[in-house]
Amino acid sequence: MGRHSTKTSSAFTKLAASTIAFGAAATIMAPSASAAPDSDWDRLAQCESGGNWAINTGNGYHGGLQFSASTWAAYGGQEFATYAYQATREQQIAVAERTLAGQGWGAWPACSASLGLNSAPTQRDLSATTSTPEPAAAAPAVAEYNAPAANIAVGSTDLNTIKSTYGAVTGTLAQYGITVPAEVESYYNAFVG
């Protein structure tokens, strides 16, 4: 094209260029819908049930996310337990992900709105028949450590603190389906007598 020739553009070319530019800008500026992280479910449970995943309020809603029996059954909850409060936190979250995929965050209207929840559902694969994880192919070597003996008198407040702390830790682990290794139990029992 010559230097002094007039440039012409068709209306179609202008429209196409505008559409592509607008689409690119919208894609870049749109918030991404990431998967619902566990922290969202924990926040929702805190709002719905005070964070108690095993709650049975007696009002027809159960578990940390306050499932009705019909919603629990409709989204496959009975694969894990009859009612949500009888299922683990992870199982309740798996059913919640299915509920989220089917109903959106409107299944928990007040709390999801007040918390600003908007993430997309995530498929979680939990099997009701698999209650314990598969053993690892090869366990790493255990380093031996002989700790110096502590001088704590039986009945002292230090020993009571150890007992209460150990009880709290094992109780929390049990809520998540984690058992304390036998070696740790035997060390603890040998220590506290």
Swiss-Prot record:
The record's keywords, sorted A to Z, are:
Hydrolase, Secreted, Signal
**CDD domains on file:** RPF
What EC number(s) does its UniProt record assign?
Answer: 3.-.-.-
Q: What happens when the gene is disrupted?
A: Not essential; a double rpf1-rpf2 disruption mutant is also viable. The double mutant displays a prolonged lag phase and slower growth after transfer of long-stored cells into fresh medium.
Q: By its UniProt entry, which Pfam families does this protein fall under?
A: Rpf1_C (PF11574), Transglycosylas (PF06737)
| Role summary | Factor that stimulates resuscitation of dormant cells. Has peptidoglycan (PG) hydrolytic activity. Active in the pM concentration range. Has little to no effect on actively-growing cells. PG fragments could either directly activate the resuscitation pathway of dormant bacteria or serve as a substrate for endogenous Rpf, resulting in low molecular weight products with resuscitation activity.
Q: What is this protein called?
A: Resuscitation-promoting factor Rpf1
